[in-house]
Amino acid sequence: MIHRVSFYGKTTWFTKQHLIDWFLCLGIFVIESVLFNFVIPPFKRYEPESNISTNTFQLVQYPLLPDIVPVWLLMLIALGLPMVVFIGYYIKNRNSHDFHHAALGLFQAFTITMLFTDILKVSAGRYRPDYGARVATGIEAVIREGRVSFPSGHSSVSFCGMTFLSFYLCGKTKVFLKDGGNILKALVCLCPFMISALVAVSRTVDYHHDFSDILAGSVIGLSIGVFVYFMNFNSLFSKECSLPKNRINPHYARDGLLSAEYQSLSISSSL
């Protein structure tokens, strides 16, 4: 039996800065959730008093329907699904370094995405397509939700989590290296994008967003997912693409530990 040598046992990678990152992300998430949901009201746009036949107001007269993808399911997709993959990979390889950076990176991406999305939502104050039906309910919380259409939070959050997961899979399958990938690897790596695209499109089907809302949200989530992934993992085009970064020893891949890390982070070539 070949003994797997974990990189975690070879060198130190965890620093005080990682703890600071965790607490900062948690603090930012809590503060922005309170501020933009309970303290800061959305920008109040002009509402025609009587002439609801204007082109602008005709666009917000769609029926009020339940979410096709409720918030709990969105969180399960954007955060739960990647975590299942990270945990499964940890169980297989026993690499704490990789698991920590994957979990931290996902939380960082989620926090930054929520911050950007909520700031833009209250700043734009755009009416949802079902705003008229929300006003008819007379419920203040429902009406308020009708004024935060741009950008789509479902789109930004789903693309954030799925982009991070897709890049994680690309790194582990080494799909961009010189020897190339295959159709199965490509499908595995691209599957998260299809999931996030379906979540985004569902927001137009239930009349909670326009296409411009979901497009903006998708760009935000995708951009932040890519940005944060490369904060924590190496380039997908390098030989170290499957490895997490190391703040204590940035050049650990050149210091004789790379073979041990590769052995710890190996993935089946049968994909």
Curated annotation (Swiss-Prot):
Pfam assignment, any one: PAP2
Regions that span the bilayer: 23-43, 68-88, 102-122, 150-170, 181-201, 211-231
Keyword Transmembrane helix: yes
Subcellular location: Membrane
SUPFAM superfamilies associated with the record: Acid phosphatase/Vanadium-dependent haloperoxidase (SSF48317)
Membrane topology summary: Multi-pass membrane protein
Recorded GO MF terms: phosphatidate phosphatase activity
Gene Ontology CC terms, in alphabetical order: membrane
InterPro entries given in the database record: P_Acid_Pase_2/haloperoxi_sf (IPR036938), P_Acid_Pase_2/haloperoxidase (IPR000326), PA_PP_rel (IPR043216)
CDD domains found in the cross-reference section: PAP2_containing_1_like
Domain of life, per lineage: Eukaryota
Record GO biological process: phospholipid dephosphorylation; phospholipid metabolic process
Keyword set, alphabetical order: Hydrolase, Membrane, Transmembrane, Transmembrane helix
UniProt keyword Ligase, yes or no: no
SMART domains to which the protein is assigned, alphabetical: acidPPc
Family that this chain belongs to: Belongs to the PA-phosphatase related phosphoesterase family.
Protein's name according to its UniProt entry: PA-phosphatase related-family protein DDB_G0284367
Annotated source species: Dictyostelium discoideum (Social amoeba)
